[in-house]
């Protein structure tokens, strides 16, 4: 398992992971919002600071996108959920941004326990996502190793 910086050629695999992970963990999205968010994400991801998790065969199995101290996105291929790739990506982000923050979906059942297990604490939230859609967010900030 290793981490490397993403390059433009990695974006298509990252989008594939995003789509698979979103389908597996964001069943609450309406079909219309899923299509809308997909288009927005596909337009945004090529400009993001992208970090990739690679398996033992050097295949990309997850990614994390950063914007300063903010973890903007973290998605792992559902086929390898629970194998430590997400944790490795977040720990890498914390080496670059020790005061990292993240906005996690309240409805994604695995997101909040995952971040809290790594030392993130709740600092607030909103009733909608950043585009005003009815998907509540929980704001978290890294408070140190639990």
Where do the model's predicted regions map?
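Conserved beta-hairpin
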Residues: 48-62
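A short beta-loop-alpha structural element at the N-terminal edge
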Residues: 2-16
């Amino acid at each position: 398992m290793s981490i490397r910086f993403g390059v433009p050629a990695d974006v298509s695999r990252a989008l594939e992971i995003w789509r698979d992970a979103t389908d597996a963990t964001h069943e609450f999205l309406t079909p219309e919002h899923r299509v809308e968010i997909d288009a927005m994400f596909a337009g945004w991801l090529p400009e993001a600071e992208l970090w990739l998790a690679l398996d033992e065969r050097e295949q990309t199995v997850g990614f994390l996108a950063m914007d300063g101290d903010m973890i903007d996105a973290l998605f792992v291929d559902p086929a390898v959920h629970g194998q430590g790739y997400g944790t490795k990506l977040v720990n890498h982000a914390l080496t670059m941004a020790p005061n990292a923050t993240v906005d996690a979906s309240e409805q994604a059942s695995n997101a909040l326990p995952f971040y809290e297990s790594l030392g993130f604490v709740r600092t607030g939230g909103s009733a909608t996502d950043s585009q005003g859609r009815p998907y509540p967010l929980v704001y978290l900030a890294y408070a140190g190793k639990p």
